[in-house]
Structure formats: structure tokens, C-alpha cells
Amino acid sequence: MYEGAVQELIDELGRLPGVGPKSAQRLAFHILEADPQDMKRLVEAITTVKERVKFCTVCGNVTEQELCNICRDPRRDPSIICVVEESKDVLAVERTRSFRGRYHVLGGAINPIAGVGPEQLRIRELLTRLNDGAIQEIIIATDPNLEGEATATYLARMLKSIGITVTRLASGLPVGGDLEYADEVTLGRAFEGRRNALS
Amino acid sequence: MYEGAVQELIDELGRLPGVGPKSAQRLAFHILEADPQDMKRLVEAITTVKERVKFCTVCGNVTEQELCNICRDPRRDPSIICVVEESKDVLAVERTRSFRGRYHVLGGAINPIAGVGPEQLRIRELLTRLNDGAIQEIIIATDPNLEGEATATYLARMLKSIGITVTRLASGLPVGGDLEYADEVTLGRAFEGRRNALS
């Protein structure tokens, strides 16, 4: 055990996700020896985020204002909503530059073991957005894992009754990948989702 | 890119050692969603460490006072000094409970590529400590790698002329290890350092 303040810092750092005891110690000693100005900037960055960053009241994405910059942007197509699990996923989709609609961040995926049911997600807010009739398509872009698939199925069934086009991101071989190393589920999906080679 | 504050936090976190862009993003979102009280504690821990923690004026170990708790402890044998590279190493030696002397933290190891020569280490402070004649043995416990070995050799040669017993930690097979998997240098050292099996 180190003396008071150092050990306390190691403990606090060790509570962060993906930071084990050894990393916490290394980070603590880095902080200890780092330039005080750099550490002041780090502390301010944490404080600012906690004080200023909120979640967009419409889509749930992170923002420093009432609405996020995508919901504020009049050039974004309001008739298509891409439903994702986390704010991080918004950025991932944005990087593709192939989606010009709006988003809806659920805040997670259905995961009964972790106690996350549909009520814990921002599904009610999604239904509210559908009320004005402007939305024509919902693209479900949850993670292609157990929880994401369960959430997608739940949403698809629920939205079917409303009569809106509901689509799901294609599953298949990753571009640049190797067919030989694809797992059987992915390869199976690639077969199911095969497309006309001439189109 | 995220909006201002979030991206700034990701950038600051990404500057920490061992934190890549993905980890920085994950940490930033954890901080964003975490309990404000927890984050306040983290910020306070960083601030406190930067404000309060100093280096012991005698041995260079981390401390919140003028002298570290080992240098302050009258039960520690003042005639033996264990020379280590970092404060972390003090803790590692302390955990063995087999050393009851004092320490001297060099603050690194000789590494010409990184621009660290003997002048950048706390070697002058070590020589000052030897002046009072109370010290009878110096145990060099630098890391068993290239830089640590170079530092050990440098110190051993320098201290030889002063006429103090200078020892180096034994190299050999790690306890609980497997002879078959030991690298040839370690195994070679284990042969060189072999001891009478009956002693």
C-alpha cells in the first residue's frame, strides 16, 4: 500500500472500466510525474464533460445543447431514423458517410441478465417521435450480437403494427476479410442475404 | 469527431500511457454516464496527488511529507540501502518483507536512446547519503533488463572506489517457473549463480 493520496488515486483509477490494478498503478505514477498543466487540463476535461454534456432530448445522443448537432441540422432527412444502442454507434455510422437521416440512441440493448428490459431503453421516446407521421423508415442498427439481435427483433415486431418500413443492417462477410476465417453464422447470413451479382 | 467537450476529454485521456483511441473513447463515455459523485472523487484524487504528493528529500520515494514513511521509520536499518529505479519498485521489495533497510529511488535507469544519462538520475543524492559513513552495504535492485543492467554496472564501478559492499539481486529461475520454458540468458545466470545445495 502506498501512502494516502497515491493509494486513493490508484483505487479511483482502478474503478474505471478496463483498468486493472497494474494499469491503475502505472496511470497513477504517470499522473504523479506528469506536467501539472497537463493534469489540470485532464481534470478540467472531466469536470467540463460532467457539467456541460447532456443527452439530446429528441434522439438521446450526447450534446452540450438541448438538441444534438444532428437533430439541429436541417439538411438531415427527418423521414429516416437509424436506431443505435449507444452514442458511440452514431459516430461509427457517421464515419461511413452513407446515412443522411436522423438517429435514435436507445442507451443500450435488451439484456435480461443485466436487468435491462425494453422499459430501460429509450423506446417510448422513439414511439413519440413516430407520432408526427413524418417518419417513413426505421433502420435498426443494433450490434450484431445476442442482445442487439433481441432488441432488433423486439423493435421490429413492435413497429410492424404501426405500418412503418423497418429495416435491419445486412449481416455478411466483412469487406477485406477472408471467407476461410469467417465464422459459420456470419457465412450462413452471407448466403441468406446473397444479392444479384449484376445489380 | 464528437462535439467539443466529449472530444476534448477523449483527447486528454488518449494522452495517458497505455490508453489508445478506443480505450479513451470507452473511458470518456464511462465518465459521461458515471455517477457525478464518483467522478468528483476521481477528479479530487488527481488534484490531491498533484498538490500534496512530493518526493522524499532523502530517498526520492513518493511521500506527502518532507521524508517518506520508510526514511522516517527509526526501526529501518540505516546501514543498508536498496537502490531501485522507481517508487513502484519500493513497494515490490516491501511486499517481500525480507528487506529492513532503507531505499534510494533513482528515478529511472540509464538509457542513452531516451536521453537519460547518470546526471538525470538521483545518483548525486546517493553519493551524498554515503558521506556520513553510516552506510555499509548498497544492494542494487534495478530491473534485470538492458537499461537496469547498465545502471547497475555504472553504480557498481562508481561505488567500488568508495569501499562499500555493493551487491546485486540474484538472477535465476523464477520460483514456480518451469526450467523448460526459461530463456537461455536466465538459465545461464542460474548456472553461474548456483549455490551449495546443502547450505
UniProtKB/Swiss-Prot annotation, chains A, B:
Biological processes per GO annotation: DNA recombination; DNA repair
InterPro entries found in the cross-reference section: DNA_Rcmb_RecR, Rcmb_RecR, Rcmb_RecR_Znf, TOPRIM_dom, TOPRIM_RecR
Zn finger residue spans: C4-type: 56-71
Record's signal peptide: none
All copies of domain Toprim, residue ranges: 79-174
Key words of the record: DNA damage, DNA recombination, DNA repair, Metal-binding, Zinc, Zinc-finger
Record-linked PANTHER family: RECOMBINATION PROTEIN RECR (PTHR30446:SF0)
Descriptive protein name: Recombination protein RecR
